From Swiss-Prot:
<keyword id="KW-0694">RNA-binding</keyword>
<keyword id="KW-0689">Ribosomal protein</keyword>
<dbReference type="InterPro" id="IPR004389">
    <property type="entry name" value="Ribosomal_uL18_bac-type"/>
</dbReference>
<dbReference type="GO" id="GO:0008097">
    <property type="term" value="F:5S rRNA binding"/>
</dbReference>
<comment type="subunit">
    <text>Part of the 50S ribosomal subunit; part of the 5S rRNA/L5/L18/L25 subcomplex. Contacts the 5S and 23S rRNAs.</text>
</comment>
<keyword id="KW-0699">rRNA-binding</keyword>
<comment type="function">
    <text>This is one of the proteins that bind and probably mediate the attachment of the 5S RNA into the large ribosomal subunit, where it forms part of the central protuberance.</text>
</comment>
<dbReference type="Pfam" id="PF00861">
    <property type="entry name" value="Ribosomal_L18p"/>
</dbReference>
<protein>
    <recommendedName>
        <fullName>Large ribosomal subunit protein uL18</fullName>
    </recommendedName>
</protein>
<dbReference type="GO" id="GO:0003735">
    <property type="term" value="F:structural constituent of ribosome"/>
</dbReference>
<keyword id="KW-0687">Ribonucleoprotein</keyword>
<dbReference type="GO" id="GO:0006412">
    <property type="term" value="P:translation"/>
</dbReference>
<comment type="similarity">
    <text>Belongs to the universal ribosomal protein uL18 family.</text>
</comment>
<dbReference type="GO" id="GO:0022625">
    <property type="term" value="C:cytosolic large ribosomal subunit"/>
</dbReference>
<dbReference type="InterPro" id="IPR005484">
    <property type="entry name" value="Ribosomal_uL18_bac/euk"/>
</dbReference>
Amino acid sequence: MFKKNDRSQSRTRRHMRVRKKIFGTAERPRLSVYRSEKHIYAQLIDDVEGKTLVAASSSEKGFDGVGSNKEGAKLVGKMVAEKALEKGLKKVVFDRGGFIYHGRIKELAEGAREAGLDF
C-alpha cells in the first residue's frame, strides 16, 4: 500500500532542500516568509549570528488589512522593506519557506521589491 504524503510534510521537505542552498549574512540577509491560514509573516535573518534583523507580519497592531488575502500580503512586504531600508539593508536573499511562489507569497515578494528591496 502506498502512503499518502500530507501537504505540511511535503512543504517541510521542500523547505529543508532549499535551506541547504540559501544562506543569509549581515550584508545580505535572508527574507524568510511563513504563511498561515489567517496571517502572513516575513523576517530578515542573519544566519551567521542566528538573529532576526527585521520582522513584519499581518498580526501586528499597526497593520491595516487582512492577512489572509493578497492585498494584506503586499502590505506586509512593503512594511518589511521599509523597516529594512531604515536599517540600511537593501539586498536580500528570498526564502519562500517551501511554499509555492504564487498567490500571497508572490504578492509579498512584489510588495517588498516595489518598496525598494533588491532580490
